[in-house]
Amino acid sequence: MNNQPVILAIDQGTTSTRAILFSATLEILAVQQKELKLHYPHKGWVEQNPEAIWQDTLEVCHAVLEHNVSMVGSVAAIGITNQRETTILWDRKTGKPVYPAIVWQDRRTDIGCEQLKAQGYEPMVTARTGLLFDPYFSATKIAWILDNVEGVRSRAMRGELAFGTVDCYLLWHLTGGKVHATDVTNAARTLLFNIVEQKWDADLLTLFNIPETILPEVRDNAARFGMTDRILFGRGIPIGGMAGDQHAALIGQRCFRPGMVKSTYGTGCFALMNIGSDFKPSQHRLLTTPAYRLNGKMVYAIEGSIFIAGAAIQWLRDELEFFQEVAASDALALSVPDSNEVYFVPAFTGLGAPYWRPDVRGMISGLSRDTTRVHIVRAALEAQGYQTRDLMAAIEEDGGHHAEIIRVDGGLVANKFMCQFLADILNKPVEVPKITEATALGAAILAGLTVDLFADLEVTGCYWQRDKIYTPTITETERERLYAGWKAAVQSLLHASRN
């Protein structure tokens, strides 16, 4: 094993940073993880410390290599996958950030997005980026920093500052400040990148008043991004793959054929369908986004984004103290026959697709004298299925394919109740892979492609293995009754917000 090549995957997520060593046959050899704090300085604001993101990344990489010293010299390449949209601006000379990272969940630019929408710009933006006006994406976050942090706009105009999503920021530091680049999937989440022409869009830069001088170069997902600074790991290691977390998961789940769907359940939930090489704007207020680009050839996906998934279960643990470990939610949900007509709409940071209502907030409905904490826990897990169903019909219609099966991954898929309910409410089989670290796995595959460990994406398909399959068990009548209750709860929330 010592002489066999290995791949180091960096998975920088919203709430943790992981370093995972993969073998050349894509088996997990070692994992190190560190939790990452979120900060909430004002209502609707969500920030992180960029320097903590970098230091945590370095720490977990060192830890995984120090615990596997015999493999250090065998690391053939590094792949990076990351929380998307989170926005960082830093000084090109010092690498120091000029402001905390504004996280993808942050809603401070709500009003600006609504103003641009009211001015009629959204159809043009959607036609070029595949996205909608929402604080979720990077452009209004960049503009906010430029306009609200003293001296930043003038420094940006002088070329002193660099912008990047987390992948780009990590690449900059890993290469000792030598490389300012991103990949097509992360660039596509900024509202500034034209995914049809595959370049930064001058009209969009003007619309958001963002200077092109701060933007990184955009590359394929499998590319020679640069070499790590020798001081970090004792030698230079090629960085060969980068992709936003959901795109990396699509690759990790081997969704290489049009019509294949993966759904990731982490902090949020993100369902993507591979739609092939043709750009198709969504007709249902979903997102069209690059799945990946290799050798200059783009493959697109339709995406439905749900802002709160596993975060709702963490909230029940941390804020309401319903249980001590997230894993306990599974047994609690199974201890009662149903949720006793309770519906939990986890709109903590607004509703994502297909509603796109950043202004609404969460709701628990159907409470009665005999409601217990167990019913609320079960309702929170059921919400993951309901939210996914909200997406799937629209994804299938937009994508032009019927999904026969859904491959799921992320931390929440360890919850057997959630996976079974997902199969029941979607009326589709749900597959869980043996390796649920699909995001890191996708980054490893991309890095391996670059250094010729794999001839192409397809050959990695033979390494995908199913761990479990969940099939529907409830009647159509029960399925539709449950879903009608969910729709009524959401409409009640939307109506209350309008009033």
UniProtKB/Swiss-Prot annotation:
Keyword ATP-binding attributed: yes
GO MF, one annotated term: ATP binding
E.C. no: 2.7.1.30
Top EC class, one word: transferase
Gene Ontology biological process terms from the UniProt entry: glycerol catabolic process; glycerol metabolic process; glycerol-3-phosphate metabolic process
UniProt-annotated binding residues for sn-glycerol 3-phosphate: T14, R84, E85, Y136, D245
Keywords: ATP-binding, Glycerol metabolism, Kinase, Nucleotide-binding, Transferase
One Pfam family linked to the record: FGGY_N
UniProt note on regulation of activity: Inhibited by fructose 1,6-bisphosphate (FBP).
Pathway stated in the Swiss-Prot or TrEMBL entry: Polyol metabolism; glycerol degradation via glycerol kinase pathway; sn-glycerol 3-phosphate from glycerol: step 1/1
Entry function: Key enzyme in the regulation of glycerol uptake and metabolism. Catalyzes the phosphorylation of glycerol to yield sn-glycerol 3-phosphate.
Protein name: Glycerol kinase
Organism: Nitrosomonas eutropha (strain DSM 101675 / C91 / Nm57)
Lineage of producing organism: Bacteria, Pseudomonadati, Pseudomonadota, Betaproteobacteria, Nitrosomonadales
Gene behind this protein: glpK
